[in-house]
């Protein structure tokens, strides 16, 4: 049996990326953003094709992502933030609800959303993960934007073939 294979495509040229950065735990979030934007540039995403908006915290990220997705101006989105465990249940609430909201935006709008909301026990853990997570999110956004385009083109080809069969 023959199988097709679509290799990962990390060419960011021409892609438009929206980034929502939470400001809570600002030093960590600034490092996440710096790493993400630097990696997007390395992948060929132009600065003018990237829009960064900030929100107060992780729970506000999904709404900003939703508004960006509704605009139709982006090929992929990135969520950046940090939730550090405290002494109350709030950590679980913020982690779970922000994650669910981020996932819902991607599925509701058929748009790649890279989740870079760190959920960690300590500030030290957060700082140790910022560079890698920021880069990973940039790469995931570009790869998934290209994959969605490729898969949509398969559907479009199938639709054209169906139209040809109807004639």
UniProtKB/Swiss-Prot annotation:
GO biological processes: riboflavin biosynthetic process
Leading EC class: transferase
Cystine crosslinks: none
Gene3D superfamilies membership: Lumazine/riboflavin synthase (3.40.50.960)
Keywords: Riboflavin biosynthesis, Transferase
Catalytic activity: (2S)-2-hydroxy-3-oxobutyl phosphate + 5-amino-6-(D-ribitylamino)uracil = 6,7-dimethyl-8-(1-D-ribityl)lumazine + phosphate + 2 H2O + H(+)
Biological role: Catalyzes the formation of 6,7-dimethyl-8-ribityllumazine by condensation of 5-amino-6-(D-ribitylamino)uracil with 3,4-dihydroxy-2-butanone 4-phosphate. This is the penultimate step in the biosynthesis of riboflavin.
Protein name from the UniProt record: 6,7-dimethyl-8-ribityllumazine synthase
